[in-house]
Amino acid sequence: MTSPAKFKKDKEIIAEYDTQVKEIRAQLTEQMKCLDQQCELRVQLLQDLQDFFRKKAEIEMDYSRNLEKLAERFLAKTRSTKDQQFKKDQNVLSPVNCWNLLLNQVKRESRDHTTLSDIYLNNIIPRFVQVSEDSGRLFKKSKEVGQQLQDDLMKVLNELYSVMKTYHMYNADSISAQSKLKEAEKQEEKQIGKSVKQEDRQTPRSPDSTANVRIEEKHVRRSSVKKIEKMKEKRQAKYTENKLKAIKARNEYLLALEATNASVFKYYIHDLSDLIDQCCDLGYHASLNRALRTFLSAELNLEQSKHEGLDAIENAVENLDATSDKQRLMEMYNNVFCPPMKFEFQPHMGDMASQLCAQQPVQSELVQRCQQLQSRLSTLKIENEEVKKTMEATLQTIQDIVTVEDFDVSDCFQYSNSMESVKSTVSETFMSKPSIAKRRANQQETEQFYFTKMKEYLEGRNLITKLQAKHDLLQKTLGESQRTDCSLARRSSTVRKQDSSQAIPLVVESCIRFISRHGLQHEGIFRVSGSQVEVNDIKNAFERGEDPLAGDQNDHDMDSIAGVLKLYFRGLEHPLFPKDIFHDLMACVTMDNLQERALHIRKVLLVLPKTTLIIMRYLFAFLNHLSQFSEENMMDPYNLAICFGPSLMSVPEGHDQVSCQAHVNELIKTIIIQHENIFPSPRELEGPVYSRGGSMEDYCDSPHGETTSVEDSTQDVTAEHHTSDDECEPIEAIAKFDYVGRTARELSFKKGASLLLYQRASDDWWEGRHNGIDGLIPHQYIVVQDTEDGVVERSSPKSEIEVISEPPEEKVTARAGASCPSGGHVADIYLANINKQRKRPESGSIRKTFRSDSHGLSSSLTDSSSPGVGASCRPSSQPIMSQSLPKEGPDKCSISGHGSLNSISRHSSLKNRLDSPQIRKTATAGRSKSFNNHRPMDPEVIAQDIEATMNSALNELRELERQSSVKHTPDVVLDTLEPLKTSPVVAPTSEPSSPLHTQLLKDPEPAFQRSASTAGDIACAFRPVKSVKMAAPVKPPATRPKPTVFPKTNATSPGVNSSTSPQSTDKSCTV
């Protein structure tokens, strides 16, 4: 029998096999389902592609129709003229050609999209239908093949099951036969053992009886042994037979198992792959590839056709040429634009003389008229040349505006990684509303100025043409055609004489000296045109060898002086920048690195003569100094290059004037900025060097300037001992309001904080310390404690002025109307001088200037009983009015004395153009009447002259204000000034903001002393004594003070320090 444990094991084996077969059968079923699902998805995809291209074909057809309608709409308007114009292609204007090509492109796109729609409907969609049908048919056949393969695999698995059962059966029989054989062997051994024991127990009795017993027992034992041996032999034969069958069955099972595993492996690895590749997907991807490539071919050909049309349009756009269009227009309408016939002389009543009569009675008149015409032409040409330069600079600005490269919209077609829609960049593009508004405003303003200058230039050229024709005919008649321009020859000879006698020409040195003294902060310097009459006067004076700008007089228009300097360099026979180095310099401009550009410019310029380099070094050092005041004069290096560049370097003939001028401007700007790195140092090249440190004494040392007298030197030494005592002690101040610094240089503090002031840095700033940090402190946000005690500020030039007792009527007159005759213009010049003197480390010239102020102030002194003045007066330092004034006193009175008109603010003087020639002439006349003699003056005579001059000046100012209200002063480079917000109605506690609103102070209030802070302020500021009450509430300033532009050296003369009012409501000391 077989053991129960063996049967249990057989059952487990069979159960495991059945489970494995079931899993395979389920897997085969899922495989067929998955293939069915793929087939359905494939059919659905092909159906979607058909629907997509069908809808796209409809859209393309609609788009084609709309494009055709659009093209026909505009072609109908231009067909009549178009037929005429296309008869001759050369008569088609370039904009019209662009328009025709654009319409043709639209029609071409319409035809292309119609073709594309037809391809979608009749080519691509049928391909997808065919692919769908083929895919479904092939899948059915593939499914049959797959089902057959699965049936074969299940058949192999069933065969393996049968062989396994047979193996189990034969193996069980073999085990059973083996156990029976072992049992028979045990019985045989047991029988043999019993026989041996019986023989041992029996005792032998007689020999005969023993022999008989033994024979019987042997016979019995033999029969039992034989039986056992026979049984053993049978069982042995049975075991051998079953064992052989079990071995054969096992071998058959192993062979079937190997075959089954090979079949399963082949089905999963090879059969399924071949079924999907060669049956299910047979031709599917290839057919789909051909259909989609048909789509790509259609789209690419559409794109190619579109690109061909766009290339034609691009060529037409590149060929947009105003000059060619002008020529075509004139050729098309030749009869309209051709010059008419000349007017012929029509004799009257038989008068046949058709030429000028140069006989003796009229010869002198013709000669005089020819000379007048020549002089007039010289002036007009200069004026027209100035207008032309301005017009060309404005044209360059317009070209920069209209040619800005803002047409690239590639950023709008950039897609994000998530395949979202096109980026919205409207706010950053050209079409943003703020950008359009600003661009249009700038463009319109520039265009208005350009057409104004163009009209002025054309009118001037017309006049020059008429006068030139008359002049030429007169010259021809008088036989003077060979005569050259006398004024030009005289000027050239004078210039050559000046150039040969000194390194820096007189006109250059004198103009730069004057501008450095009085015009560094003049708004629009070198940009605003001056008076041509005054330019000619100054130029003629220089040609005669004179220096009309020598001395301290300031009755010249700053713009006219700047025009003289530009005119000089423009008229040089040999310009500073020769034309043979033009291309080398233009090559330097293309370098992006500023240092490398400067190095290459230096190499190019070093080949020039030393005299030219000295003049260049002098000029560009001055221009660099001037550009440091760009916040006041609105002239940064780029603006200076635009206005001054054409005068220094002209574009050679044969070059594009507009494009080359932009490179010239960039070159001049680079030289202005990098002049120290470009030009040789004084050690490398000896010669005059422009000095920035306060031009007053520097230019007085010039061979063309005035020398300082011995009296001035003595007074400087005396004044130095008195001003150096208080230079070391700082001033304590209290913060009136909270202030937060806008830069690292400005200090931040809270209201009530204690501040330490070192010195006055500008009109609106102090240099001081707070919480151990040094920096700038705004003047309007603090109260200086020294002023509350009635003590005049330290280091103020006013502290050295002695108060002189005068009759009461003189004091009233001085307060009421003893104004400087030159009005606001001279006040501006004086304050500009003070600003320049602040930047000078030397104190001698500053004391000299304030010494002059003391002479000028002797006619407007305050009450001698004022405690603020009496505390700091020096008893013998000031002469009385009845004594003879020093040499420089009368001239400088016009700058610093009589503060009535000094109440004009800087912006008001700029707005009203108080530095116009008319006001200066009036001011000069008034000054010459009352101050230009060196004999003792009577105070009443001075007061009467001043009152008469003031009345005349105010009348002129009223007239000028009415004219300036409609006068437009254009700006070439479109610098934008902040609108002036000064109200014409002035509060009772403030100073008048304009000479037209100046009121005479006739109430004899005691002790009004002018604050020393007016040395840097434009508005006239007075400090009331403690008894004066201010009713206005305390408020912080409406606007923050403008940071000043400091020189490179930190040494500031103590003579320019000033104090503030202790009252927070006294805003008259600020601008």
UniProtKB/Swiss-Prot annotation:
Give Gene Ontology CC terms: cytoplasm; cytosol; dendritic spine head; glutamatergic synapse; lamellipodium; nucleus; phagocytic vesicle; plasma membrane
**Annotated F-BAR domain residues:** 22-325
**Entry annotated with the keyword Ligase:** no
Q: What is the effect of changing residue 807 to Q?
A: Increased interaction with ROBO1
Q: Where is the composition biased (Low complexity)?
A: 855-866
Comp. bias regions, Polar residues: 705-717, 874-885, 897-907, 919-933, 1047-1071
Coiled-coil stretches noted in the UniProt entry, renumbered to this chain: 362-401, 940-967
- Report the locations given in the UniProt record: Cell membrane; Cell projection, Dendritic spine; Postsynaptic density; Postsynaptic cell membrane
Swiss-Prot/TrEMBL site (Arginine finger) positions: 527
Q: Which GO BP terms sit in this record?
A: actin filament severing; dendritic spine development; excitatory synapse assembly; extension of a leading process involved in cell motility in cerebral cortex radial glia guided migration; filopodium assembly; inhibitory synapse assembly; lamellipodium assembly involved in ameboidal cell migration; negative regulation of cell migration
Map out region (Disordered) in residue numbers. 181-211, 698-726, 837-936, 983-1012, 1029-1071
> Where mainly located?
membrane
Protein modification: Methylation at Arg-927 is required for the stimulation of cell migration, dimerization and localization at the plasma membrane protrusions.
Q: Which molecular function terms from Gene Ontology are attached?
A: GTPase activator activity; identical protein binding; protein homodimerization activity; small GTPase binding
SMART domains per record:
FCH, RhoGAP, SH3
Residues the record lists as Phosphoserine modifications = 206, 427, 500, 691, 695, 724, 795, 916, 930, 990, 994, 1013, 1027
- Disease involvement: A chromosomal aberration disrupting SRGAP2 has been found in a patient with early infantile epileptic encephalopathy. Balanced translocation t(1;9)(q32;q13).
Domain comment from the record reads as follows: The F-BAR domain mediates oligomerization, binds membranes, and induces plasma membrane protrusions.
What is this protein called in UniProt? SLIT-ROBO Rho GTPase-activating protein 2
- Native organism is Homo sapiens
